[in-house]
Amino acid sequence: MSREIVNIQAGQAGNQVGEAFWRMLLAEHGLDDAGMYKGNDPQQIARAGVYFTQVDSSGPTKYVPRSVQVDLESGVCNRLRSGPLGQLFRPDTYFTSDSGAGNNWAKGYYTEGAELIDGILDIVRRQCEATEALQGFQMIHSLGGGTGAGLGSLLLSKLREEYPDRMLSTFSILPAPNVSETVVEPYNSLLSIHQLVDNCDLTICIDNEALYDIAVRTLKIKSPGYKDLNQLIAKVMCGVSTSLRFPGQLNGDLRKLGMNLVPFPRLHFLMPSFAPFYDPKARTFQRLSVSELTSSLFDKKNLLVASDPRFGRYLTAACIFRGKVSSHEAENSVMQLQRKNSNLFVEWIPDNVSVSLCSVPPVGQPQAAVALANSTCMQELFKRNLDQFALMFKRRAFLHWYTGEGMDVMEFTEAESNTQDLISEYQQYQEATVEEEEADIEGEQ
């Protein structure tokens, strides 16, 4: 039986990345743009029910995404409706308005978003009612704007209230340190992080700077556009969900993934990586061994987040290998990597790297691997954000845009101190040793 996931894509970035994700998902499951099965391997659709609802009124079965598309502007969703995937989504799963959130978190969370949230929740409920064993939700959004960040945060808190025992996971696109879209990004993203810490079980962090580097350095794209970057995010999203969508032996659902990756509930921010990324011109000359694939996964160049794992320690990680890879090889190469870099892995969590295999490779590649890592170097991201936030907040810059929407200055202070706490928790576990952890556990008992 498929344990279903409801996908929610919020805001401009969420819907554009969502489109790339669904396109790749269709290709992997042998479905065409209208959701009709065109493949020849029954394994392709054995567990397609995780993300798709099957509709067979009369004639062949159509696979419809279990998805909700939300935006406070209608432009991106209209393009989705009239684009190649126009026949794919159910028309009643779109929710748009024309008010816009103007890159203002408070508009998305308090004013515009709060007026519309009930209508959005109705669509989500309808999708949930049509499932047999809902495992949880995944949200695709960016943290720098108004809709994905503000309305996305509001939606998460409502889902947490209404479905307290279901997994909430997000693919959250953080503002890039060097590529700024709007001046108030530091406010929007810190207010969102504050919400994600409390209302989410798994947050997979992605930032545009790291994506841009991969596109330029590795893929040799001269001036990458969002379409190129979204393609990279979709690769990782499909890779991460492999063990949910195809028969496999480990991390078969979101909760198991969470149990293996999140040792402390607040520290659920994960770094994704993918291998191999390579220049399409050189692909015919490349075939990586399993140990090369493994070391690429833990290499800064293959991370979709601009942080350096050498400055932190891995609490946990999950590696997913796709294609013809034997479990013996995969587990051996991960063990060797841990042995060689033992200082980068905490020693007080035994067996902290899980390995799962999927025999179905990504479309157009003989093999690939993806990893999700919970590393203390994630604090770099939050520090960077906090510093930019503090610079503006100290001068009370642009604060009137937020207080004008009914927000209290106290909320900014709370978000700041919650993020400071998060950073010091990461630091504490980075420096912890086996003895300290054992003492802590005994103390708690």
Swiss-Prot record:
CDD domains: beta_tubulin. It is found in: Cytoplasm, Cytoskeleton. Pfam families: Tubulin, Tubulin_C. It comes from the Eukaryota. One of its GO terms (molecular function) is structural constituent of cytoskeleton. Its main location: cytoplasm. GTP binds at residues 12, 73, 142, 146-148, 208, 230. Keywords: Cytoplasm, Cytoskeleton, GTP-binding, Magnesium, Metal-binding, Microtubule, Nucleotide-binding. Its cofactor is Mg(2+). Mg(2+) binds at residue 73. Belongs to the tubulin family. Tubulin is the major constituent of microtubules, a cylinder consisting of laterally associated linear protofilaments composed of alpha- and beta-tubulin heterodimers. Microtubules grow by the addition of GTP-tubulin dimers to the microtubule end, where a stabilizing cap forms. Below the cap, tubulin dimers are in GDP-bound state, owing to GTPase activity of alpha-tubulin. This is Tubulin beta-2 chain.
